[in-house]
Every structure is written in C-alpha cells, then in structure tokens.
Amino acid sequence: YVFLIQAFRDEKSISDRIKVLLNFPPAGHSALDSEIEKIEKVDNISYAEKQKLAIKTAVNKGILILTGGPGTGKTTTLKGILRLFQSEGLDISLAAPTGRAAKRMTELTGKEAKTIHRLLEVEWDEHDRPTFKRNIRNPLECEALILDELSMVDISLFASLLNALPLGCRLIMLGDSDQLPPVGAGNVLHDLIESRLLPVVELKEVFRQSMGSLIVTNAHRIVNGEKIVTDRKDGDFFLMERQTPALAAKTIAELYAERLPRAYSYSPLRDIQVLCPSKKGEAGTVNLNKILQSLVNPPSDNKNELNSGFRLFREGDKVMQIKNNYDIHWDSDKESGEGIFNGDIGIIEKIDLKSETAFISFDDRTAQYAKEQMTELELAYAVTVHKSQGSEFKAVIMPVVNVIPQLCYRNLLYTAVTRAKELMIIVGTKDEVVKMAANDKKTRRYSALKKLLLNDAAPAILGTTGI
C-alpha cells in the first residue's frame, strides 16, 4: 500500500478504536423480550423479527450498524433502541454529519441531535486549523452514542469521533450503504460492513404504510436494478419525457416556479429542491440557478444585492455553504456558536450595503457573512446530488438527460430519489433513467480499513518525510 500519512493514521485509528469498543461489551439485559413487548404495547406497534434483532443487538452487544432503504423501519427501530437505553438511565448523545440531518434526527426522536463537529466541540489551533476539544484525552461524557447518516462520514471525522468515545460507550450507527460515499476520503460504512467484524442488521422488509409510495417502491427497484414504475397518475413519482437538456431546463423552471406551487401549495424556496447530476450543461446547477433565480427572486428596488467573486447574491436568495467554515458566528433562540458547514442551505434575509454583510438564516440559526466569506456560497435553487446527502425535501425535481458516463450510475439516482419525502419528478428520457438504474458500478474508493480491521498487525510507516 501507498498512503498519504494522515489517511493511514485515520484508518489505523478507526481500526484500533473499533477493536477496543468490541472488547468492552455491556452487561447483558436479562428481561429484554418483556421490555420490547412493553414498548410495543405503549406505542401500539409490532416489531418485525429483524427490528427486534437490531434492538437486542444494540442493547446486548453495545455496538451495531443498522442499515436499510426507505420504508424499512429504521426510524421505528431507532426509537425502540433509544427507549431501552433511556430505561437503563444511560446518558445518550445523538449525532449526524450535517445540520439538516441532525435537525431531522431531532424531529424524529424528540431528543436533540448535534452535528459531529458541535458534539466534539470544534476549536482552532495556533495555525487556525480546526481541532476538537473532545478527544482521547478529554472524551465525551455520554454512555451511548447514536450516529445517523454514516455513509456521509469520511475517515478523518470518524477517527476523531471514535477517539472521543469513552471506554464502554455504546455505539449505534445508522446508514444506507446504497447511497453515495462521502465527499471526503474513505468509505467507512461500506468497509465496516464488508469486514464482518461488527454486528450488522440490514432491514429489507418494506412496511405496509410505505408500500403505497412510488418513491419507496422505485427506490428499492433502482437498488435491485429493476424497471421503475412511472405510469401511475395518482402516485408521488413521475417521469416527464424531455429529449434535450434545453427542454428539460425549461420544464424544470415551469415546475419549480409555477406548477408545483400552484398544484401542491409548495414554497419554491423551502419545499422544492432541484437535484442535478452535474454542475455543467443546460440542465446543470449553474445554468438552472441563473434561470430559477430570475423567476422566483428577480431584481427589485426593494432587494439589496452584493457581488462576491463571480456570483451575484440578492436578498431572498436560496444559498448553500460549499466548504466547512469554523469561524462564521451564528445565533439561534436557544444558543449561539461558530461554524457553518459544507452542504448547509439557507436563505439570505438581509444584505447591509454599507457594511457589505449578509444575514442568512439556516433553519433555526442566523449567521452573519462578510463579503469575502460569501465566496464560500453558491445559489442553491439547484444543487448537485452529492451536495444533497443528509437532507430531505418535500419535492425533488431531477434532470436525467445527457448525463455524462462518469455520473450515470445507480447509487447517484438512488440517492436523489431517497431525498424526496412527498413528490419525485424526473425530467429527461426513460432510456437514460433505465441506463442509470442498470449501472451498478460504484465510484471506487481505495481504502485499507477493511484489511486493518481484519488484521492484528498493520504495515509499518516508511518514508514519511515530506508526505
């Protein structure tokens, strides 16, 4: 193997910490079946056998990967695990890689979830580089950590998180291995599952309440390489045939600005998201953002504007942070802090021309941006599928026309479809959708994590000078 030295250290650290966690299992629970039955009675539910297995494994083993597609009951299972941990009086922390994923986790569980960066209390070293206050010398105080969207977590962040876990801490990880790998290095979820060293429960059964959804049905059909269903007029999944990128862009603009708001009372800014395979081309994010900005947030004497880099931003614009920034200050009703992270989506509420600053709301937080910091923003009426990971939207519109071969693969289509909660519309050609769903080749990630997990000895680090 040839490694970047930091990548080796991260993967070796992950391997070592996982083995330590496996060596400190919790005491078994003697009356687990009766406790599960109590939860079923109180919540008026009936767990499937795989869900019961996941709950028992989480409690008895103390470490678990829970994976499965939409509609398979991951959230219901998570709530059961959470209830049992709470009944044991454990101090529980919930975390996710992005602000939106953490917010969704909070809404689903009723317990506050934090981003991994917030949980680890990010701070800065003398070179103004991010470090974490919580680490192996100053571990977290939780007795159980539940981590969602593991597929998005790269090796660097996962290594930092594991190093901050105290001995004996239970670790429950949720993710969907059919989604895209993280933007950063590694493929943690895939490698952990492939190692077969950790307990893994995969939920496959789609529950009755989800079976009527074509979004759920087609997501599973895509994963299995099957033909998707698009001919149900009463469904929540539609394909609008358009043969060229120009025609697709025109249709997307109409759907976003007029047809969906009129038919479904959706807010273009808050409820509808265009997800593109690529930035480039007439049906790419750059062109679509210009079109959609002109339609839903046109110039006005009442709206201040600010140029930053080559981008024009206007009050009322939907924007996305495109890199982690640990310096930007934000305030919410409950607290204040620093840090706006890659993939966070917000609305420009106000631009102060005198000070050349913008005030941007990111869900429940408001951040103040200086003009030079706005170079880290892009318009977000349309974003790439990669940037949408960890988010959900009421309605998703996706162009699938003239997709370049490097992006014409199954897990990109699957990731886009699983972002939609209520409505999914593909604008393009059926042939390309079929081609995309049939291509199960995944972006190859070069990693030694699986090998490190399975081997007791790691290769020596040679020739590290200058790496």
What is the role of each PLM region?
Residues 224, 333, 342-467:
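C-terminal accessory regions
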Residues 1-31:
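Interdomain "pre-motor" coupling segment immediately N-terminal to P-loop NTPase/helicase cores
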Residues 177-339, 349:
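Conserved helicase motor core of P-loop NTPases
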Residues 64-106, 174, 237-244, 248, ...:
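Conserved RecA-like ASCE P-loop NTPase motor core of nucleic-acid helicases/translocases
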Residues 166, 314-315, 341, 388:
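Residue-level recognition of short, solvent-exposed, well-ordered loop/turn junctions
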Residues 33-49:
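N-terminal pre-Walker A segment at the start of P-loop NTPase domains
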Residues 44-60:
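N-terminal pre-P-loop "Q-motif" helix
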Residues 57, 80, 84-90, 97-108, ...:
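Conserved helicase motor core of SF1/SF2 NTP-dependent helicases
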